Swiss-Prot record:
It comes from Lentinula edodes. The keyword Chloroplast does not apply. It holds the Pfam family Ras. Coiled coil: none annotated. Residues 181-200 are annotated as: Disordered. It is a lipid-anchor. This is Ras-like protein. The modification Cysteine methyl ester is found at residue 214. Residues 215-217 form a propeptide.
Length: 217
């Protein structure tokens, strides 16, 4: 047991998206397991939670960010420090869906990378009767980004854990690929070019296990 606790990997996750898409509700449902009904625009909130994901302990540092345009100047700061990003839109708002590409482009520009760990999250899937964005549109956008896609509901807790777990998995995969590339540049073994997601469409993979033994810190 002592060996398992000698090193606790911390992951800096950032939740981004337009105003009113449910970023805070999604984050609080994941961290505290309850739904926040009232809409109170966020400036910036940070949460920590310890989880076991794929038999590996992870300390998640989750930053819930402002969606309002007046706080746009703060974006580059958290984009510089984030290791992975949940790109959240609401299925009831086409405008929020169209904003996702802008957020993604800004992340790549700030990181100076061709690709970076992200997951496209279509929130409010419980409001099917108000849907403006089809599931296939979200899946196609994620495929274009080379990342995973998941539809969620913070209200009834659908796929909430999966969204955050999938982002941690994307970060782990990205870091391994970067290490492989580093070994190649120093004469090591094979691998793909920096930041590429080799193999099949990430959305063809299984949903993965549930998050066991999570602790809010």
């Amino acid at each position: 047991m002592a060996g398992r606790t000698t090193f606790l990997r911390e992951y800096k996750l950032v939740v981004v998206g337009g105003g009113g898409v449910g970023k805070s509700a999604l984050t609080i449902q994941f961290i505290q397991s309850h739904f926040v009904d009232e809409y109170d625009p966020t400036i910036e909130d940070s949460y920590r939670k310890q989880c076991v994901i794929d038999d590996e302990v992870a300390l998640l540092d989750v930053l819930d960010t402002a969606g309002q345009e007046e706080y746009g100047a703060m974006r580059e700061q958290y984009m510089r420090t984030g290791e992975g990003f949940l790109l959240v839109y609401s299925i009831t708002s086409r405008n929020s869906f169209e904003e996702i590409s802008t957020f993604h482009q800004q992340i790549l520009r700030v990181k100076d990378q061709d690709t970076f760990p992200v997951v496209v999250v279509a929130n409010k899937c419980d409001l099917e009767y108000e849907r403006q964005v089809g599931m296939n549109e979200g899946r196609d956008l994620a495929r274009h980004f080379g990342c995973k896609f998941v539809e969620t509901s913070a209200k009834v807790r659908i796929n909430v854990d999966q969204a955050f777990q999938d982002l941690v998995r994307e970060i782990r995969k990205y870091n391994k690929e970067q290490q492989t590339t580093g070994r190649m540049m120093t004469g090591g073994g094979g691998g793909g070019p920096p930041g590429t997601y080799a193999g099949k469409d990430p959305n063809d993979e299984g949903a993965g296990g549930c998050c066991g033994g999570c602790v809010v810190l």
